[in-house]
Amino acid sequence: KDGYDTTLFNLLQLKDSLGRFTTLTSPHFQVRMEKQEAAVYGQRVLSLLEESWTELVPRYEFEPELPVMVEIYPRADDFAVRTFGIPDVSGFLGVCFGKVVTANSPASRRDHPTSWESVLWHEFCHVITLQKTGNKIPRWLSEGISVFEERRADIRWGQHMNHDFRDRILGDKITPISQLSSAFLTAKSGEDMNFAYYESSMVVEHIVQTHGLPALNAVLNDLNTGVQINDALDRHMGGLEALETSFKSFLTEQAKGWAAGVDFSKEAFAEAKPTDLESVKSFLETHPSSFSGLMTQASLLLQDNKLDEAEVALKKLVELVPGDVSTNGPRRLLADVYRKRGEKEQEAAVLAEHLSRTADDLEAAMRLQDLCNDAKQLERVVEQGQTIFGIDPFQIAAIQKTLAAAETLKQNEVAVAQLSTLLELQSDDAPRLHYRIARLLKGSDTAQSRRHTLLALEQAPRFRDAHTLLLELKRAEIAAEPAK
């Protein structure tokens, strides 16, 4: 009755969107997705979720209530309304409510791509920890376990040490374990929140390394019975005070070992003129380990097309800070040097090393696939296509390269999957795509081959090649019939 009821309006908008959804099922999961998205990457979602079940359920000695429901939204506002009741809420990739997970589709994150696979793995960890503890787990421990398990599943996932975390740790800004819940509540910036996630995951890593997974499971069991977190940690970790001390030592050593000897402070560099190469070089004579100075020098050399000097500077930076996976970090700039010089082999090697450490850099992954394609390294083209698919499954150029390589390699299953994806994304080319699928399936699945041939002819009745294939299938069927 109220035409200005914003809640009702938002819910009606969501209802319209849900009308375009379909449901996919597997032994343990029920996934709701927009129909086209389900056709593109729905089966990989189910496969990944079942893999996470197989890995995590035995580890945490707990089987969640079935089915676990996962909803993936291609519109960020639909995700926000379903999750929070209001649109225009940013900063969340996924949310878990115990039995239900809501997540943003990669289609809603085209401007800021991330690995959607790591997000789903992370959220299923929450399903386990929330249900195992009866929702009595503090946020820091649940988030810590999820990020820790991301890193265990794939070293490219989760959060890793960076120079901001390093500076916070060495600057004595570690939040005591007994107060970690407050780190999420009092975060004043995205950087504060990221550090809360990272520190929490490192507490979990330290607990598992020092006291073992059974001790962590014992803490979760205690939480379920109503024991407070600090009491549970005190009981199973040899005393909370001892855990605090050992963790601080552990995390400090991790920070000291990351880019040891590099100065990440920016105060001193403010004295230099960051746009003047000679001024920066002069600054580095007295501050040779300044990260800001070294990076600025490399950027200016690259800008001035002094590629040999830039290469030397960037190689030094890569050696000093091997864990930097930022998109504007030393490895990415070094790859730019090789790209400008046309040294494709060296560029590919640097990008491959970079992508062995991060699963979120779509631009680098696309470029590496191009380089592998140029070098006729077809196995790597297919491999890189799968990497790209795990970030953004809607990249048509990557799909086409993966398809061509798979066809050449006779990897028919991969090729059919790529063609099926293109059917959803390029429906105007459907007759030809159906025909290509039919050709690939001819020797392994006659029924499906015939089906796709007929679908091609349904949309293009004069498609001569499809008529020829249909006759070939019929002749093969007759030849296979037993003699009477």
Task: Identify the role of each PLM range.
Residues 143-151, 214-228:
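Acidic helix/loop microenvironments that form the catalytic cleft of cell-wall polysaccharide enzymes
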Residues 156-157, 207-218:
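Substrate-binding/catalytic groove segments of enzymes
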Residues 21-139, 149-158, 165-196, 200, ...:
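Juxtacatalytic substrate-recognition/specificity segment
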